[in-house]
A protein has these predicted regions:
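An N-terminal hydrophobic leader/cap segment in hydrolases
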Residues: 16-62
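Short alpha-helix in the alpha/beta-hydrolase fold that links the catalytic acid
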Residues: 100, 206, 215, 229-239
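Alpha/beta-hydrolase fold nucleophile elbow
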Residues: 148-158
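Membrane-embedded segments
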Residues: 64-142
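Catalytic histidine-centered segment of alpha/beta-hydrolase-like enzymes
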Residues: 253-262
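Acidic catalytic loop of the alpha/beta-hydrolase fold
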Residues: 224-228, 256-257
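Short beta-strand/loop motif that positions the catalytic acidic residue
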Residues: 213, 219-225
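Hydrolase active-site cap/lid region
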Residues: 161-215
Length: 274
């Protein structure tokens, strides 16, 4: 039996070249279309009618010429202590996120949910990081037209923690709540697989923004969150700012900490103190 090592070598080289070409193609595609991977919106028709079991007001907030963000404001069940500005996660739209309103309205707060660009009934889509920061500030500016700043709480969940942390760093709300926060967007995506940092067009450095946050900071994170690892992200934030951040690890919880009794009880106590 004669083995043609040259022929085998050529085949292996062709296979390796094809593999590298596919990897390169995947990286180029990811770089060009990364917004479509990182943002996973549910698009709603402009004439979509929301239905919830509690009162709400639908609002369109202008953030740029010809760009409005659709938002829902749910009033408190009793005398309102203020408003929670809620920046949601990377999937779905307000018809789903609004189902969480009762968690906050039961605790004497109005809550404003806002859909990002490309989500729900909001216009446009994101093409650069600066648009994220612009929108976070414009939404906060809108809230200031209806509430005193000392009555505003900012809450961010998952991808929304970047929006929330930025807004808190540029303003003076009375409290910042972060649920399943990431250290930075670069770190989060790099942790998900063999994706080089230079390929990621968005940094969203939450750890930097937190340096300029002057209000109290409360972090909630599930101990079994396999999407945003609590040790790689919120623990590092706590270690970086040990005196600024109060971190609560929700035992046994995954990414959606709001589904647990521990979260609800701790949130109730927190909001009662504010």
């Amino acid at each position: 039996l004669k083995i043609n090592f040259k022929k085998i070598g050529r085949r292996l080289l062709r296979i390796l070249a094809l593999f590298l070409l596919l990897v390169l193609f995947a990286y180029v595609f990811l770089y060009i279309k990364q917004e479509r991977f990182f943002f996973n919106p549910k698009v709603l028709d402009k004439d979509y009618i929301y239905h919830f079991d509690q009162p709400f007001e639908e609002i369109n907030i202008p953030v740029e010429e010809d760009v409005n963000l659709n938002a829902l404001l749910f009033p408190s069940d009793s005398i309102s202590k203020g408003v929670i500005l809620y920046f949601h996660g990377n999937a779905g739209a307000l018809h789903e996120w609004g189902e969480r309103a009762y968690i906050y309205t039961e605790n004497n707060y109005d809550v404003l949910f806002v859909d990002y660009r490309g989500y729900g009934k909001s216009d446009s889509f994101y093409e650069k990081e600066a648009e994220i920061y612009n929108d976070a500030q414009k939404v906060y500016d809108y809230v200031l037209t209806r509430y005193k700043e000392e009555d505003i709480i900012i809450l961010g969940f998952s991808i929304g923690t970047g929006f929330a942390t930025y807004a808190a760093s540029k303003n003076t709300p009375k409290l910042l709540i972060l649920e399943a926060p990431y250290y930075s967007w670069n770190d989060l995506i790099s942790n998900m697989g063999p994706i080089p940092e230079w390929l990621i067009d968005y940094e969203i450095p939450s750890y930097k923004f937190l340096a300029d946050v002057s209000c109290p900071i409360q972090v909630f994170h599930g101990s079994k969150d396999f999407i945003i690892d609590p040790d790689e992200h919120s623990k590092r934030l706590k270690d970086l700012y040990p005196h600024k951040i109060n971190r609560s690890l929700i035992k046994g919880a995954g990414h959606s900490v709001h589904l647990t009794k521990q979260y609800y009880d701790e949130l109730k106590e927190l909001l009662n103190n504010y």
